[in-house]
């Protein structure tokens, strides 16, 4: 298609003017942006990293993780922090709920000595701290726990029973407008944990909604819905949860995928169990009866023993993880081949059998 040379000259002139005024890279042709391959941080779950499409949560973006109580929201964010710290990144945790357990965080691999933590008095203070950390360019990951606990100053200073309609929504809307651009500039990942509420009078459709208004829904590049779907038992004792995460929104890859994994109490995401399941599904690990083998060598009888072997041999676990990431991230639809047990059933920790 023939382009008017006068238009080309005018466009070149205005692009030079914009870059001179606002800095290099402030405007460019989309095809020339070589940074479209987004930097990511692992969630701690291989299947969730694959479901996200990019291999983890994207840097420089806003992410919302929501779900019912005790579904694993904080655990998932602590796994992200631990993964980021292993890469030498600086992380901050804004504990608006005043409920962060440092002992549990340490068990998940979080370096609590180097984790920045704030327990703000008001929602405005929490969001101002987020903005200051973001603009510094020195913090890579910020977690806010939770949006529901970000109480506006006017509500705290008022009386119980006073009406404060829309205050939290306005506060979040203003904060999102301010934070979004700064996060992109500083390449900081900001994760909001959110709670679920029920809409009154909804007869058709989903009555569930999240707190804090609609601004976060629009500004978030990724939204994850996390649910507990079953119990993991060791004998009669419940030792963990079967967990399902749905990618409700995704601006960096295809949305609406889901991942299933186990969260063990006091240990976090069961990575080795996930490696065993995915390894068998994609024929990296052989299964004959109850025995599991890798490259001809038996690694354990029963899923739990195979997982224990991988825990004791991290080099082999890393090798399997790397191979699976190369396979699944180049072909995300391959994840659908994983044969999961029904999420409505309980799973025996020792044998992996449904009961």
Curated annotation (Swiss-Prot):
Gene3D superfamilies: P-loop containing nucleotide triphosphate hydrolases. Its main location: cytoplasm. Signal peptide: none annotated. This is Protein RecA. It is found in: Cytoplasm. The gene is recA. Belongs to the RecA family. The keyword Hydrolase does not apply. It holds the Pfam family RecA. GO terms for molecular function: ATP binding; ATP hydrolysis activity; ATP-dependent DNA damage sensor activity; damaged DNA binding; single-stranded DNA binding. SMART domains: AAA.
């Amino acid at each position: 298609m023939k382009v008017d040379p006068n238009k080309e000259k005018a466009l070149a002139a205005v692009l030079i003017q914009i870059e001179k005024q606002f800095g290099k890279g402030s405007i460019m042709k989309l095809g020339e942006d070589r940074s479209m391959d987004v930097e990511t941080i692992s969630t701690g779950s291989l299947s969730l990293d694959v479901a996200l499409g990019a291999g983890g949560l994207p840097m420089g973006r806003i992410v919302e993780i929501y779900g019912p109580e005790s579904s694993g929201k904080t655990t998932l964010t602590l796994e992200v922090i631990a993964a980021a710290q292993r890469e030498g990144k600086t992380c901050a945790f804004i504990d608006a709920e005043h409920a962060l357990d440092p002992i549990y965080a340490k068990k998940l691999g979080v370096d609590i000595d180097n984790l920045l933590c704030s327990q703000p008095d008001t929602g405005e203070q929490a969001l101002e701290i987020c903005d200051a950390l973001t603009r510094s360019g020195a913090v890579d990951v910020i977690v806010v726990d939770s949006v529901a606990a970000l109480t506006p100053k006017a509500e705290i200073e008022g009386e119980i029973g006073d009406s404060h309609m829309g205050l939290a929504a306005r506060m979040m809307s203003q904060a999102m407008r301010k934070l979004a651009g700064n996060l992109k500039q500083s390449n900081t990942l900001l994760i909001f944990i959110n709670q679920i509420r029920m809409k009154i009078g909804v007869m058709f459709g989903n009555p569930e909604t999240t707190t804090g208004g609609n601004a976060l829904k629009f500004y978030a590049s990724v939204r994850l819905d996390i649910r507990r779907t079953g119990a993991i038992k060791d004998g009669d004792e419940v030792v963990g949860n079967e967990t399902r995460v749905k990618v409700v929104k995704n601006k960096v890859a295809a949305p609406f995928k889901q991942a299933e994994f186990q969260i063990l109490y006091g240990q976090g995401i069961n990575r080795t169990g996930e490696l065993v399941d995915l390894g068998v599904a994609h024929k990296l690990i052989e299964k004959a009866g109850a025995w599991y083998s890798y490259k001809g060598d038996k690694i354990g009888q029963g899923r739990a023993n195979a997982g224990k072997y991988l825990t004791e041999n991290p080099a082999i676990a890393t090798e399997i993880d790397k191979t699976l990431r190369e396979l699944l991230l180049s072909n995300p639809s391959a994840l659908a081949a994983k044969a999961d047990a029904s999420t409505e059933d309980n799973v025996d920790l020792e044998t992996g059998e449904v009961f």
